[in-house]
Every structure is written in structure tokens, then in C-alpha cells.
UniProtKB/Swiss-Prot annotation:
It comes from Saccharolobus islandicus (strain Y.N.15.51 / Yellowstone #2) (Sulfolobus islandicus). It is an enzyme of class 2 (transferase). Keywords: Cobalamin biosynthesis, Methyltransferase, S-adenosyl-L-methionine, Transferase. S-adenosyl-L-methionine binds at T24, G48, C49, G50, T51, G52, D72, A101. It catalyses: Co-precorrin-6B + S-adenosyl-L-methionine = Co-precorrin-7 + S-adenosyl-L-homocysteine + CO2. The gene is cbiT. This is Probable cobalt-precorrin-6B C(15)-methyltransferase (decarboxylating). The keyword Ligase does not apply. InterPro entries: CbiT (IPR023475), Cbl_synth_MTase_CbiT (IPR014008), Cobalamin_biosynth_MTase (IPR050714), Methyltranfer_dom (IPR025714), SAM-dependent_MTases_sf (IPR029063). GO terms for biological process: anaerobic cobalamin biosynthetic process; methylation. Belongs to the methyltransferase superfamily. Archaeal-type CbiT family. Its EC number is 2.1.1.196.
Amino acid sequence: MEWKYVIPGIPDNFFERDEEIPMTKEEIRALALSKLRIRKGDMILDIGCGTGSVTVEASLLVGSTGKVYGVDKEEKAINLTRRNAEKFGVLNNIVLIKGEAPEILFTINEKFDRIFIGGGSEKIKEIISASWEIIKKGGRVVIDAILLETVNNAISAMENIGFINLEITEVIIAKGMKTKVGTAMMTRNPIFIISGEKQ
């Protein structure tokens, strides 16, 4: 499938899905990718790649001169990300690794320009610490979180490690749903997008 636009936000229904595998929804994904500030040729790491929606869109943004690494502890997620990458024709500049963060991150022999941390890992502090070791100077880290505890732990860890220009954005999305008498707005769970830079 070809995504012919130069902006992120591929509709969710364009991706192959699995009910057991989480997906970063299109509006949140578009905001998270904008916070990453991806450039052509960047090296990107997607920790907790899930369905591969962020991996695929990041790959489209970095182009053929960049590379995106997708990491997930679930084999089903790795396989689903692979299928979605094939569907969008970007598998050639994606590397998929099965393993659990933060441990698996130290086996990757690369430094990254941008790191996206999706989902709600209990090891968020350790993952942020590992990210500091493998991100280039001037690199950006963006985290999506649902739980307030994850937000608190992430901000605390980022401040203590030395990330600068920290931002937190709370996003509440409501989508229209047709009913018998009109359109009702259905609110999704609030998502927090946390970002920071390594100086």
C-alpha cells in the first residue's frame, strides 16, 4: 500500500491489526512523530513497536537513507510489524528485534537520532536510562504514556539523567460515531506525550 502524503497520520484501518497487540492510534501517532522531529537519514529506535504503526511511519519519514529499528518482547508483535512494513513497502530500511527492553537495547550496535518509547512498561526508568546511553548528542526521546505513574517515573528519570527541554502534553481525542439520531462524540483514554533532548 502506498502512503502518498508527506505528513504522518496514516489511518488506523490501513494497518493490519491484532486485538492482543497494542497500536498507537493515528492522532496520537501524528503528534508523537511531530515531537520526534524526524529528518531524512535519521536512525530511529521504536521500543515496544506493537503493530508497527510508528515504525512504518518513521520509516517513511527517514527515507531510504535512514533506518528504523523496531523492538518488542512479543513474537506476534514483531511478525505483525513485519507484515505492516511489507504492506507499506518499507521493510528494506527496518530492522526488527525480538527482546525485552532495557536489556535488549545494549545488544544493538547503533547510536540513534530519535527514540520512541510506546506503551506502559514497568521498567520505564531503566528504559530511559538505557536510551541515554544509545542516543546521539542532540537526539530526542518521545514517550507515550497512559498511567500517571508512568508519567511521573518518566519525568523524574529524564530530569535525573540530564535530558533537557522536557515537555508533557496531555491529549484527549474524541471521535464521531454515527447513531440512529445523529453523531455522538466518543472519547478515548487520555494519553500523555513526554519529550526531551540529550544535550
